[in-house]
């Protein structure tokens, strides 16, 4: 595997040279984009290696928030997308629907919006999801989802139906969650992590989750022992 750190607009001729000398058909490439303004780095620059790109990571800690991921569908073998730090809270993710191999999506800086759920609900191959503000009432079925990391979970009531094969769940800073009975419906769970669920007062009996092997609790200030 090859990780390419992109800090400025790439030189297309140098990318072609890289393709000729280092990158072969079997080389898997992850683009790690971290510039002063990631909006200036168009995905079309990477057309010559587009079939090799299996991961895109966008890191942005300047005032230039990421406004678009237009053109990302050029990477037809893309399996993982990480969008970290500042991005437009109305970021259009519609193009992800055409990425038939996408297994991982990380977008947890801003809460997911009602405009983004229709796309999320079509990502049937998704195995790993890291997100903020998830409401299970807005989900349709994500049958292949195995790992869920959620900040500020709004409602988990229907996760057992919507993500029946979930094996690992981590929930952080979620004061809207008052009870954890929905965990009982996640029959395949092997790992549970709870941190900052400040209004949960008691844990349900998890003894029927026969696959559960690990659990961590932190900052559960109202939880009664």
Residues covered by each model-derived region:
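Concave beta-strand-loop units of leucine-rich repeat
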Residues: 2-95, 101-140, 144-178, 182-225
């Amino acid at each position: 595997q090859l990780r390419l750190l992109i800090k400025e607009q790439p030189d297309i001729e140098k990318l072609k040279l890289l393709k000729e000398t280092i990158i072969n058909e079997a080389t898997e490439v992850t683009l790690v984009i971290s510039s002063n303004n990631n909006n200036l780095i168009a995905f079309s620059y990477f057309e010559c290696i587009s079939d090799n790109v299996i991961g895109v990571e966008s890191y942005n800690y300047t005032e230039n928030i990421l406004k678009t991921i237009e053109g990302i569908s050029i990477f037809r073998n893309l399996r993982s997308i990480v969008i970290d730090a500042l991005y437009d809270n109305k970021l259009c993710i519609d193009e992800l629907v055409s990425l038939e191999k996408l297994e991982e999506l990380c977008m947890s800086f801003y809460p997911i919006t009602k405009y983004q759920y229709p796309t999320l609900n079509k990502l049937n191959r998704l195995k790993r999801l890291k997100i903020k503000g998830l409401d299970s009432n807005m989900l349709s079925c994500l049958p292949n989802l195995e790992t869920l990391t959620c900040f500020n979970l709004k409602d988990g009531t229907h996760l057992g139906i919507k993500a029946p094969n979930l094996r690992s769940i981590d929930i952080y800073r979620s004061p809207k969650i008052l009870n954890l009975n929905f965990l009982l419906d996640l029959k395949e769970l092997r790992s549970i992590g709870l941190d900052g669920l400040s209004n949960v007062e008691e844990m349900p009996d998890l003894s029927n989750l026969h696959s559960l092997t690990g659990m961590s609790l932190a900052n559960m200030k109202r939880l009664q022992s």
